[in-house]
């Protein structure tokens, strides 16, 4: 390469480098190179120059209001209620008893008082009977709970049912007391306050 070419190349390189540095350090009268608003030492007043107009004001300076952030929706809360199945159903049955209906009336009232996302009804049984029979019985019980809640005005698309049969005991199945505790319906309500 000859000397004029080297000189032209060096000059072009210097121009490109200088323009990059200049643009990186370009600061209008409102922000520093890092994008922060320049303010006085007490952080109360914004710096501006003679070209400032109210139309060029930025939020947080010179009376220009800061845009309000939209309110975040409260996170859904979950409440889990466990009902003994003996309260809802007779032994080996899936038809709701009057006491069970009264409790489900309270559940429906709670569900209507919130911005409901979902209700999950999970039926459980004790260990008496075959696994397949108990699974079907627990599913029928959960379906009865759903049908009743739907009859009380709860959206059926918001209610999910599941039967666990005898798979999730919370007490020993060796005693009558333990078996009674294992015959249960768990109802979980998920939603947020209105």
From Swiss-Prot:
One GO BP annotation of this record: monoatomic ion transport
PROSITE patterns named among the record's database cross-references: OMPA_1, OMPA_2
Location within or outside the cell: Cell outer membrane
InterPro entries noted in UniProt: Bact_OuterMem_StrucFunc, OMP_bac, OmpA-like, OMPA-like_CS, OmpA-like_sf
Membrane topology per record: Multi-pass membrane protein
Sorted UniProt keywords: Cell outer membrane, Ion transport, Membrane, Porin, Signal, Transmembrane, Transmembrane beta strand, Transport
Statement: the UniProt record of this protein carries the keyword S-adenosyl-L-methionine: no
Signal peptide, first to last residue: 1-24
GO CC terms of this entry: cell outer membrane; pore complex
Transmembrane segments: 30-38
Homology family: Belongs to the outer membrane OOP (TC 1.B.6) superfamily.
Protein's job: Structural protein that may protect the integrity of the bacterium.
Protein name: Outer membrane protein A
UniProt source species: Bordetella avium
């Amino acid at each position: 390469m000859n000397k004029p070419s080297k000189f032209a190349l060096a000059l072009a390189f210097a121009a490109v480098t200088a323009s990059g540095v200049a643009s990186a350090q370009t600061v209008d009268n409102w922000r520093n190179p890092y994008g922060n608003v320049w303010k006085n030492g007490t952080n109360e007043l914004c710096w501006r120059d003679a070209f400032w107009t109210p139309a060029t004001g930025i939020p947080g300076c010179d009376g220009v209001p800061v845009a309000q952030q939209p309110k975040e929706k409260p996170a859904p809360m979950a409440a889990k209620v466990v009902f003994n199945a003996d309260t809802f159903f007779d032994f080996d049955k899936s038809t709701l008893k009057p006491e069970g209906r009264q409790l489900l009336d309270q559940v429906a009232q709670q569900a209507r008082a919130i911005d409901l996302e979902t209700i999950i009804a999970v039926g459980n049984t004790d260990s008496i009977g075959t696994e397949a029979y108990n699974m079907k019985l627990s599913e029928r019980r959960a379906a009865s709970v759903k049908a009743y809640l739907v009859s009380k005005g709860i959206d059926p698309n918001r209610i999910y049912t599941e039967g666990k049969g005898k798979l999730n005991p919370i007490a020993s199945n060796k005693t009558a007391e333990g078996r009674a505790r294992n015959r249960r319906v768990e109802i979980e309500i998920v939603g947020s306050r209105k």
